[in-house]
Amino acid sequence: MIPKTGFALWLTGLPSSGKTTLGRGVIGALRERDIGVQLLDSDHLREVLTPEPTYSSEERDWFYRVMVYIGRLLTENGANVIFAATAHRRCYRDRAREALDRFAEVYVDCSLEMCMSRDQKGIYQKALTGQARTVPGLQVRYEPPPRPALTVDTERHSAEECVRQIVDRLETLAFIGKERVNLDRIEEVLGS
């Protein structure tokens, strides 16, 4: 029996815009509905694939090709996938759109100033002190999606509200069935 193709959702935005937080929240909301989903978080994948990343153009091209390939393997075998990755160049996300049958892109919108204030990994500080030279939003341009399936504003809306918007959009796209989202449970998941 051939498994049903899973969906792929790409959360894109500047570093520290809230992609991983929202990815975890969406996973929690979907698991409450017995919908399995795998998070492919670029930070975690980098620890395995490029433990000492250079963030060069060549390395990023390779990394996002591998990330899309992993996503394709998962979705072709029925798994649902959420990518939480800046992927600052549109071509990275376009490659995923071309390779994955049921694909949607969510733009996690947040000002550079707010992202810098949220930065727990010190990415922006490294850029400002010259320790990093290719940080999206500062030294390299971030290319926002021209027509995302959804834009969520993590500066104006809570993580819970953004998760609700994303789950609603997954329903509208018919990636998942319609069901009421339990916001209390989302808050629990995001708090852990």
Feature locations, PLM:
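Glycine-rich phosphate-binding loop used to anchor ATP phosphates in small-molecule kinases
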Residues: 58-104, 108, 124-127
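Hydrophobic anchor at the beta1->P-loop junction of P-loop NTPases
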Residues: 11
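The conserved Walker
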Residues: 15
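Conserved substrate/cofactor phosphate-moiety recognition/catalytic segment
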Residues: 24-72, 76
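Small-molecule kinase domains that catalyze NTP-dependent phosphoryl transfer to phosphate-bearing small molecules
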Residues: 117-165, 173-190
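Conserved nucleotide-binding/hydrolysis micro-motifs of P-loop NTPases
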Residues: 44-46, 87-90, 109-114, 156-158
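Extreme N-terminal, non-catalytic leader segments
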Residues: 1-8
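Conserved lysine of the Walker
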Residues: 19
